[in-house]
Structure formats: C-alpha cells, structure tokens
Amino acid sequence: MTRLRSAASTITNRSTPALALTASHAGSHPAVIVPIQPLLLTLERRPSCPHRVSYPEIEAYRGISSSLRSHNAIVRASDIMAQIDPRDVGTPDEWVPRHPELIRLTGRHPFNSEPPLKYASTFITPMALHYVRNHGPVPRLEWDTHTFSIDGLVKKPRTFGMNELVTTFEQETVTFPVLLVCAGNRRKEQNMIKKTIGFSWGAAGCSTAEWTGVPLHVLLTACGVDREKAQWVWFEGIEDLPHDKYGTCIRASTELDPECDVLVAWKANGELLGPDHGFPVRLIVPGHIGGRMVKWLERIHVSDHESSNHHHIMDNRVLPSHVTAETATAEGWWSKSPYAIMELNVNAVVILPNHDDLLALGEDTTFNDIETYTIKGYAYSGGGRRVIRVEVTLDDGASWQLARIIYHERPSKYGKMWCWVHYELAAPMSSLLCAREVCVRAWDSSMNLMPAFPTWNVMGMMNNPWYRVKIHHEQDTNSLRFEHPTQAGNQKGGWMTKERIMTNDVDSIKMLQVEPLDTSSAATPKPGLTADELSELPLIFADEVAKHNSKKSCWFICRDLVYDATPFLDEHPGGATSILLCGGTDCTDEFESIHSTKAWQMLKKYCIGRCSSTEDDTGTSDTSSDHEETDVALKGRTKVPIVLISREVVSHDARIFKFALPAKDLRLGLPIGNHVFLYAKINGKTAVRAYTPISSENDEDRGFVSFLIKVYFAGDNPVHPEGGLFSQYLDGLHLGQQIQIKGPLGHFTYYGDGNFSLETTNFHAYKFGFVAGGTGITPVYQVMRAILEDAKDQTKVALIYCVRSQRDLLLRKELETLQKLRPGQCRIFYTLSDMELLDRNDPIVRGWAYGKSRLNFAMVKNIIGSDAEDVCMCGPEGMIEYACKPALLKLNYDLKTQTTVF
C-alpha cells in the first residue's frame, strides 16, 4: 500500500513517535489534483457579490456564524481546475469542462458523478467538485436568450428573461448556503445487498454551496398566484429526454412559505451557474432531495393537482421492501403519492479515517486514556431540522460517545438550518486497538435517528443506516487499517463486497448474501440463457459488430455475447445517445456498473449471437471511443491506411518512418501516453505491432505521423536468428507503400498540469520518474514533451535512459532541447552498459559524465529519488523486472500503485 502522511487527523499527548497516521490508496495512485489545505476552509460571504441579502423577512438570518467570519471563505470554482475530459469527446457534452477527480458513476454519458469523499470535509464545496446528477445531455443555453414562464393558477402569467429576472427583483435577491443531496446517496451499500434499479452512488453524493436567487414566493406573488386553489407547483426543465422533459412538483404550501426559503437561483458560490448545475437558472428547495430541484428551468406551473410527468412518477420514491421493479409497475405502486420522497432524512458519514487509511503503531502498543485519534465526518437532516447529536460507537452500540458538532451556519429567522454539519471525536487509542469497527449515527431535532441496519428498497434511495468502518489489525505492518463499506461507482474496495450484512426489513428478516461485483467478461453471462440456447447462437466476429454503430443498426458486445439494441434505442431510459456511444464495441464494464438484474433479463430478447475476435483483434484492448471526429485520423476500431513518405536512418539499427495520413489537414488524434497498432500483410498473414509515435498533435505535424523504430536484423541475435518480422518489413518498404494504423489504445493518458489517468481512474503527480531502455524512450519522450513544452505545466520530471553505447542514445538532441526549456524542472541521466567492458582509463570512459554501467539502485535513488508520485518504465523486460522494480521497492514505492509500465 502507498502511504501518505496526513495532517488532517491528530494523535495527541504521546511523548514518543510510536504512532503516525498514513493514508493508504490501495489499488490506486495517489491522486491530489486539488491540494486539500485550500479546501479546509469555512464560509464567509463574498463581498463582491452584487446581490446582497435584502428581503426583509430573510435579512440577517442567512448569515454564517460570526465566529467564522475571520476566515477567507469560499474557494471559487475557477480556482479549482476543470477541463474538457477526453471521455466526453464524441458525446453531446464534449463542450462541458469537468474536474478530473470527479468519479463517474454511469460511464461516459449521461454524466453523473461525485467527488472523492475527502472533499466532503469542507463546509462549502467548490462547484467544480460539486456532485452532478444529469438525466441526459446538458442543454447548451445562452443567458441573453433563455426564458422561463410562470403560468397556471396565476392572474398574471409571465415569461422572464434572465436580465429581466435579475434587475426586476434585485432588492429581493438573497444569497445563503444550502446543502444538496441526491436521494441515492450511499446507494451502493444497498446494491451490495441486492441490486436496485439505480446506479451506485457512494457516500459523497452531497455538496454545499452558497446560492443566489430570488425567493419563489416573491415571484409567485408578483404573478398573482391563487393561494386558495393552488395545491401543487410544477417545475420543468428545458432538456428533452426519452419519455418527457425532466419535471416534478412540490406542494404549494412549501413553495409559498417564506420559512422554506425556496429559490429560483442563477448563481452558486458567487458565480453564474455552470452547465452541469443548471445554467442559466434552476430551482433550489432547501432541506429536500436534489431530484426536486429542477435545472435549466423552463416552466413553473401552479396547479390544483399533482404533476403526471414521467420523471415525477417513476423516480425518487421509497417503495416497500417486498416491491420489485416488475411488481411496482404491474400493481401501480409508482403512482402512489405517499411514497414520493420530499424532505431529506437524517444521515451521517465517516470521512476520516478514509478508506484504507493506515494508523501505524509503534512497538509500544500500550496506551493511556489521553492518547487519541480524531474521527471526523459530516451529518445532515432535512426540512430545516437541526442535527442535535452525533454519536460514535467502538463496541457495536454497547456504548456511545458524543462527538463535537461544528455548526457552520446559524439558524434562520424561523429556526431552519439548511446545511450539513461536521463532527469530530478524539477516540482513545486504547479503545481503537480493541475495536472491530467504528460506527456513527446522528439525531435531528425531531428525534429522528439513523437505524442500525439498512432497509432495502427497489430504488435504493434514502439509505441511512449507521455508517460502519471496519478496523483490521495488519500484523505485517503493525498498523490499523480502516475499511469503508463501499467505494463509489465501479471502483473496487469496501467490506460490503466480502461480508454478509443484516437487514431489519420485516418482509425479509434474514442474512442477505452480498452480490459479488464480478465484471470479468469471462464470467457466466447473466441474461438467463441456457447452455443449449448459447450453443445455438451464431458466431459473430468483433469486426462485424464494429460495423453496426449507428442508429440504423446498433450492436454491442457484453460478456462475450452480441446484442442488437436497435429496437430499444427510443425506449432506453437514458436516451439513445448512451447506447450509440457503445455501438460496435464491447461495453461490458459500463453495462455492469449501471444496470440492474431487470436490465440483464431484458437483454435476453436482444441477444443475436456469440462474439469472437478476429485474428487482428485477438488480445488487443481498444480503450478509445469510436466517434467520428472530422479532423483526426484515428477512428477507434477502424483501421486507417497510411502511406510511407520518408525513411531516415538515425543509427545503425534505428529508423524514423514518416507516414502520410489520409488527408493533409488531419491530426493523428492520439492522447498523450497512448499508442497505436500498425498492421501489415507479411507472407500472406496479418501482422500487428504496438508503437508510440514521436510526432505531435501540433499544427506543424498535421497530415503525417512519424515513428522511431529499432530494426531487429536477422542474424544479430542468436536467440532470435530470424530477427524482427515487422521491423524488417518496415525497413524494406518502398516510398509510397501502404500499411494500416488503428487506435488510440493504452491505459495511461496524460492531460496536462500533472493530471493523468490509468484506465478510467484519474490521478495527479507533482513529479514523474521515467526509466527508458532503447526505443522504450518513445512513450517517455511523448509525455516529457507534453509537460516541458507547456509553460504552465510545473510537473517535475526525472529520466534515466539506459542503452548499450552512445550510438544507441536515440532522441538525445530532442531530450536535451526539452531540458534547456525547463532546466529546473527536468533532470536527465544517461547510462551506458557497454562501458562496464572498457578499461576505466579508456578516454571514452573518462570523458563520459554519466552512468557507466547497467541500471542500479544508486542511479534510481539519486536521479528519481523517493518522492515521485508515479514512475513510468518502458524497455526490456529484464531491465524492468530485475533492475527497476527492485530499486523502486527498496525506495518504498508500491509497485501496484506507483508504477506504470508502458
């Protein structure tokens, strides 16, 4: 495990350094894109906000407690990096900037995400790290042209433009903080008991921001609302979804009540709303679930009856535990109004210790009562109810300790509190050593109490049992390891994937087996096909599936079976786009992370065959999307012809091959850190090899792609006397001859400013270490160039380049040019193994200022050191396995979480 020192928790009154808290990121790289310190701030009103609290019924009651006013408060969303995520390219949302640390819960599209749980430790959430719940594409709206209407039971129906709204109600505009929570927060715990019909929210589906807008009751009053007849107020957004626009409703008694503080908002944290958060205008209903707060607001309708909108009826309900998705529809459960969720329930979560944190113990493990470890977390309730108590137990509820509650806001004039609180408890080390788990529960002012165990419901909503963090005594490291119940989305980890848990469901009082999260494509297919049915299915090659990627014919692969989704496109609850993005590809991971057992059963009717890879695709992994970009050459699974236009001899056995792309204005379209496959017919058979180009995506490289390739000549190596099949073929190509290229592929992608991803998980590095051998320099050069040619990128790099002799040093001139650009940021060290064979007094040896041997521990220690967040390696297997990895282990690198092999 990788262990990072944490200053966020304390162990007090210990005279010897026997204890140290370490944060472990098992199975992932340390990811600190936003430094935690700037986030550990509390809220103060932004003095520059033009719309102050002035409405007389609310004035002076939206303030934050005076003890917090000395802090420089909100972290602006613009201070937190957001960027266009490559995963959004080819989707309707490819124009929307998003923070790379947001955890995607529903694949590429639509976008639903939550931040890592550690960011819930701050009162105000930067909007770039605010959770997002979208049902479809983000509408692309303009401030100057967007309008929304108010109609129904009002005397003066009106349509408001944004400028009119802001100026007309400037005196009534208010700003105050509100917690937003998705009703599915903590749903993954329910999915571990039994699959619900909802995707797997973790424990960070909640965020607090400072919202600016006009109270809804002011708008309704201005329109002459009929208070006697009005029973419900409907809200609709502008987006078009498969069944209906997104709409819902809330009782008029809530909307017209000044105590309830319902807002029509256009700002968050002092800035105009972002695209994912409803720009230009949305609804804020404090104390209620996020599903009632319509974004991209287009219509407000006052009515004497409840809305029949599809999303109001079919979403955000807690049905009895015995009700399944099928019986809910057959028996009419969805339309029963009492099961609709409005206000939030009481809930609490442990933030510190985080999942897989380690609490290292010294040799002396006898502790007195004043030696403590601080447990921290958040708690909230709905309806404006105050959280009055947070309790922690270390003995499974036999006794409880009161945590100190940190209130960031003060109550409104009416006694309402709309935000979360944070709590902390200094737990005695002597108790932690004997404990099996840390459990937390909260109470609110109505004496609502979190239950000990979950009650399953088909939508997995409002899950609020005690939050349980398991404690494991790790004998090999003499430390305590903390394990949270789950990790958000399709992330691995959590004790609920391994154990049984209890339920107090009166219809099913029994131990429920946790469903395994097996996403292996080799696992038994789920759709209920028998062995006989499987054997009768025709065999369909992956190349054939790849052709069916349009609305006219959309096939996909899931768990080695082929499905024709064309008839289902218009019926899909998430819209046709999310299926079309997977058209022609294997979408096993996305399907399994999102869909319920019901969806698996529905698959059966669309199954048309068994999948088999073609010869060309066997064993390859295409991580790209198959969207058609007009200015790039690479087309995902499609092979693209390229023509050799030059060959440059750069050493006795290395060549630069330059190929023309299909059009001179095309970029290759290769993300930094990715590679491509080259295909050629050799001796009547298709051969394929992976290479990384040395050309860039810059304008000067449009229209062509260049590769630096070592030619393995026949007879050079007695172990492989025939030499390299593919490299010799390339060396023998005549100008004008054609091969094929396919991609992009690869598990490592660099986005800039230290941000990178491995597979689908985002990380951040302040320093990279690189070790390259021979032509393994090409992917390293690609990443180093991206860093060092970007004046804004401050990421440090340290390279050890291992070759046999000076003539084998490829790209040396280019590397040293990069170093001259950023000398304080880049360190390069060469080492020549052939010098071990020469006399020390040889002039060649004496004149060489770098390494004179094979790679060794001293080189890695002195050049790369122990402070790189990730060490990337590319070269001969022997160099990596017997030199790189042992040296990195000795420097306490975790090979699983801190190294990447290209």
UniProtKB/Swiss-Prot annotation:
Chemical reaction(s) catalysed: nitrite + NADP(+) + H2O = nitrate + NADPH + H(+)
Gene symbol of the encoding locus: NIAA
Protein function: Nitrate reductase is a key enzyme involved in the first step of nitrate assimilation in plants, fungi and bacteria.
SUBUNIT field: Homodimer.
Record protein name field: Nitrate reductase [NADPH]
Residues that bind heme: 572, 595
Cofactor: FAD; heme; Mo-molybdopterin
Record keywords, A-Z: Disulfide bond, FAD, Flavoprotein, Heme, Iron, Metal-binding, Molybdenum, NADP, Nitrate assimilation, Oxidoreductase
Gene Ontology molecular function, alphabetical: FAD binding; heme binding; molybdenum ion binding; molybdopterin cofactor binding; nitrate reductase (NADPH) activity; sulfite oxidase activity
Domain of life: Eukaryota
Domain FAD-binding FR-type: 637-751
Residues that, per the record, bind FAD: 689-692, 708-713, 725-727, 778
Residues binding Mo-molybdopterin, per UniProt: 182
Keyword Oxidoreductase in record: yes
Residues in Cytochrome b5 heme-binding domain copies: 537-612
Gene3D superfamilies tied to this protein: 2.60.40.650, Cytochrome b5-like heme/steroid binding domain, Nucleotide-binding domain of ferredoxin-NADP reductase (FNR) module, Oxidoreductase, molybdopterin-binding domain, Translation factors
SMART domains documented for this protein: Cyt-b5
EC number: 1.7.1.3
Similarity comment: Belongs to the nitrate reductase family.
Cofactor comment: Binds 1 FAD. Binds 1 heme group. The heme group is called cytochrome b-557.
One example of a Gene Ontology biological process annotation: sulfur compound metabolic process
InterPro entries xrefs: Cbr1-like_FAD-bd_dom (IPR008333), Cyt_B5-like_heme/steroid-bd (IPR001199), Cyt_B5-like_heme/steroid_sf (IPR036400), Cyt_B5_heme-BS (IPR018506), FAD-bd_FR_type (IPR017927), Flavoprot_Pyr_Nucl_cyt_Rdtase (IPR001709), FNR_nucleotide-bd (IPR039261), Ig_E-set (IPR014756)
Residues reported to bind NADP(+): 872-879
